[in-house]
């Protein structure tokens, strides 16, 4: 039965990759093997083959439809005016913005700058961003004009990729600047009732529990995470308990199975109570947005209820496998969704390692049993958490032991309070004492959650930043983990001492393999690299040595207010940089320091700075706020003078950083021309960083007589017309020039004259506008350059 369940669960994953080759590979075997009743085996096999054929055909057709939609989206070149005809299937509010999901039957838009238009007929999902939905309702047919584009893609490693995220949900096109031309009067009555119920429940939640706690309750009950404040979200994420914010099996079990039990006692009928409970759960799923974890839990609950109606007990693996097949049939792309994978990994954790560990540690103690199950779930989901989020909370196992049991209390009490406010609004609206008593248990538990997380964050190694790992490492880890558990179970049950010794030896070998995998994961992708992050209009450079030394040179943006949170932290975590050894600041402009200020101010970012390095004779006045913040955080401040140098690493892998400018002799007042100039040397290659240095600063630098030659030049002042002069380029003689600038910036960077000068000196030019983040790797074999886009 275990093998059958694993095959069922793995089949949809195979289907996604097989669809790309033109063949769907779904497989559902039910109970054709291992069933005690062998007489009907042939019938079950034939039925399984028929189901296999139908699922294969459906999977192939869905895969083809998704491919067509993806190819249609690729026709879009930036923002293009277009039109849509379709039907609204979901309306959701996110902060001050509304997101309207439409099944489009007809899409048209212009092709580039030409007058040619692209027209597509066929059902496809489109996401519309609107400031106000007015009288728009679920189920309405509409015709509209808008600006169409593809969702934004990630420009940096580790950054959130909206294009990939929405593609997993079958959405390849988004629309903005909406103008509704025609709107039908018919709409879904049930959909509208659920929409209004969701909005009203959210308002009640905010009024009863307060804005902060209410946002958490809305996430847990209504699937609305838009109101959760940044600090709460990070607190839960860093401690490995963010999963409680997603609607999953716990919620469905509490709502659905409790309702089923109550109705069964009231009606005395399994069938009637089952139908009513399933109907309520389906409506609840629709109201909360049908997230992948919600759908999985709903399907498994339906199977469980049907099993009880039929007098049979469902198998967890078979139920999970069936749920995965159904979800993959509806939307094959969801298999690659992180939420989908984590949801099923948790179920598998209970079914496979959980079952094996219970055999290893048989106990009637509920605390020990719960701890064992938490460990099993952590082992199952941990590798995926590392793969997607590049970090792991060491104490999450123990926190979940305390936190998860109380989730049911939060859900139950919250539902009772909200239901009471909906049913008896006149009685409870002004009764603050009654409402306060009802809300008290929830507010108390959430306060305990926060306090536990804050205590955990004060412990050493509370969060381990692993960096990105390969898929193969994840696969090997799972194989080794299951292998170790199976061997230990067999060794424990073996009667012969010799067999037990062999099992233990095999187990030791597998553990050694697992340790090697963990070591490889820890040292994965550790080549020396210089990453020019795409921060928009600004500068942000990460230097990561093979010895694990992390250096930042600037980090800020004038075009993105949250460059530290949304760009720098993800990039640092992607490369496993839990701390920055040295953060160099060339000068105090916002587009060079705003991200570093964020790292210094946000203690929950998971990144710390050890040393802040600033020019002794540079733009110190504009760095006042930055220096004050660094002192407050206990960061060591180093003042560097022109002509000084520092090194890190050993022997041939030593990295030299030469501080060339400004010095005590520098006679310039302009803040940009006082930018720190740093020359990096590694294995005979060099990179020159110039901040916002202009032509006057360049002449001053040349007159000081230092070695300016470099293989790679970070072009000064984002490619400004008044920077990177011909004289300076002759002194540097770069093979590669990298420009960091924002797309469609108001300064016109990089300027055409600057590009002409770079071309004349023979340097290859790469810009973050065109390539996104640019990674320069230096090895014994030379320099290699790759763009992230």
What are these regions (language model features)?
Residues 1-74, 296:
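N-terminal leader/targeting segments
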Residues 3-22, 231-397, 413, 468-524, ...:
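Hydrophobic alpha-helical transmembrane segments in multi-pass membrane proteins
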Residues 546-551, 556-614, 703-720, 733-738:
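Active-site metal-binding motif and surrounding structural segment of the metallo-beta-lactamase
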Residues 328-336, 454-582, 631-709, 770-789:
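Core dinuclear metal-dependent hydrolase active-site scaffold
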Residues 168-298, 305, 379, 531, ...:
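Aromatic-rich juxtamembrane segments at the membrane interface
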Residues 611, 698-772:
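Cap/insert and terminal regions of metallo-dependent hydrolase folds
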Residues 350-461, 735-740:
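Alpha-helical transmembrane segments of multi-pass integral membrane proteins
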Residues 58-243, 565-570, 617, 624-647, ...:
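Membrane-interface helix/helix-cap signal primarily in integral membrane proteins
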């Amino acid at each position: 039965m275990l093998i059958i369940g694993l095959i069922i669960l793995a089949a949809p994953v195979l289907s996604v990759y097989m669809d790309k080759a033109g063949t769907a590979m779904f497989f559902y075997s039910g109970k054709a093997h291992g069933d005690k009743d062998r007489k009907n085996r042939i019938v079950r096999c034939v039925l399984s083959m028929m189901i296999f054929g139908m699922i294969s055909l459906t999977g192939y057709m869905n895969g083809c439809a998704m491919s067509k939609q993806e190819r249609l989206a690729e026709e879009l070149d930036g923002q293009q005016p277009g039109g849509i005809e379709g039907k609204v299937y979901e309306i959701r509010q996110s902060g001050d913005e509304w997101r309207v999901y439409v099944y489009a039957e007809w899409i048209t838009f212009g092709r580039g700058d030409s007058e040619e238009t692209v027209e597509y007929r066929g059902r496809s999902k489109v996401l519309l961003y609107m400031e106000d939905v007015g009288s728009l309702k679920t189920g309405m047919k509409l015709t509209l004009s808008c600006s169409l584009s593809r969702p934004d893609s990630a420009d940096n490693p580790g950054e959130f990729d909206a294009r990939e995220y929405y593609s997993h949900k079958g959405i390849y096109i988004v629309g903005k600047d909406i103008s509704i031309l025609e709107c039908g009067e018919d709409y879904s009555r049930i959909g509208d009732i659920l929409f209004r119920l969701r909005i009203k429940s959210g308002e009640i939640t905010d009024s009863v529990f307060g804005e902060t706690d209410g946002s958490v309750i809305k996430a847990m009950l209504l699937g609305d995470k838009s109101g959760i404040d940044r600090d709460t979200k990070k607190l839960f994420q860093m401690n490995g308990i963010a999963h409680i914010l997603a609607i999953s099996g716990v919620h469905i079990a509490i709502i659905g199975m409790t309702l089923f039990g109550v109705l069964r006692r009231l009606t005395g009928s399994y069938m009637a109570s089952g139908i009513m409970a399933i109907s309520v759960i389906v409506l609840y799923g629709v109201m909360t947005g049908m997230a992948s974890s919600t759908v999985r839990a709903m399907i498994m609950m339906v199977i469980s209820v049907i099993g009880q109606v039929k007098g049979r007990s469902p198998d967890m693996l078979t139920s999970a496998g069936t749920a995965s097949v159904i979800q993959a049939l509806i939307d094959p792309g969801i298999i690659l969704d992180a939420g989908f994978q984590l949801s099923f990994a948790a179920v598998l954790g209970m079914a496979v390692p959980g079952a094996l560990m219970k055999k290893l540690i048989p106990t009637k103690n509920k605390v020990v049993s719960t701890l064992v199950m938490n460990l099993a779930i952590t082992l199952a989901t941990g590798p995926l958490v590392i793969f997607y989020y590049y970090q792991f909370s060491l104490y999450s196992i123990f926190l979940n032991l305390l936190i998860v049991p109380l989730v049911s209390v939060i859900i139950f009490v919250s539902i009772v309070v909200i239901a009471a406010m909906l049913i008896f609004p006149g009685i409870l609206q002004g009764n603050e004492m009654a409402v306060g008593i009802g809300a008290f248990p929830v507010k108390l538990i959430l306060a305990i959650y926060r306090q536990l997380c804050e205590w955990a964050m004060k412990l050493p190694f509370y969060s381990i930043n692993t960096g990105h790992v390969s898929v193969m490492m994840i696969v090997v880890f799972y194989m080794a983990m299951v292998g170790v558990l199976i061997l230990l179970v067999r060794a424990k049950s073996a009667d012969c001492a010799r067999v037990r010794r062999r099992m233990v030896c095999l187990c030791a070998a597998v553990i050694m393999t697992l340790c090697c995998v963990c070591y490889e994961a820890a040292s994965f992708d550790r080549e020396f690299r210089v990453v020019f992050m795409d921060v928009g209009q600004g500068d942000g450079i990460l230097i990561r040595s093979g010895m694990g030394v992390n250096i930042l040179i600037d980090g800020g943006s004038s075009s993105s207010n949250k460059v530290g949170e949304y760009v720098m932290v993800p990039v640092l975590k992607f490369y496993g940089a839990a701390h920055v050894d040295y953060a160099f600041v060339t000068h105090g402009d916002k587009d060079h320091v705003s991200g570093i200020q964020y790292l210094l101010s946000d203690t929950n970012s998971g990144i710390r700075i050890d040393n802040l390095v600033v020019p002794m004779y540079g733009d110190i006045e504009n760095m006042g706020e930055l220096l004050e913040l660094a002192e407050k955080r206990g960061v060591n401040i180093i003042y560097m003078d022109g002509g000084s140098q520092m090194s890190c690493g050993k022997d041939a892998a030593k990295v030299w950083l030469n501080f060339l400018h400004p010095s005590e002799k520098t006679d310039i007042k302009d803040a940009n021309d006082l930018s720190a100039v740093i020359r990096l040397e590694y294995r005979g290659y060099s990179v020159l960083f110039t901040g916002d240095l202009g032509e006057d600063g360049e002449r001053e630098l040349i007159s000081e007589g230092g070695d300016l030659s470099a293989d790679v030049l970070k072009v000064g002042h984002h490619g400004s017309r008044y920077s990177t002069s011909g004289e300076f380029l002759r002194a540097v003689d770069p093979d590669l020039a990298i420009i960091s600038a924002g797309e469609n910036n108001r300064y016109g960077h990089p300027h055409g004259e600057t590009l002409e000068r770079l071309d004349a000196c023979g340097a290859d030019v790469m810009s973050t506008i065109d390539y996104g983040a640019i990674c320069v790797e230096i090895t014994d074999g030379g320099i290699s350059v790759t763009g992230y886009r």
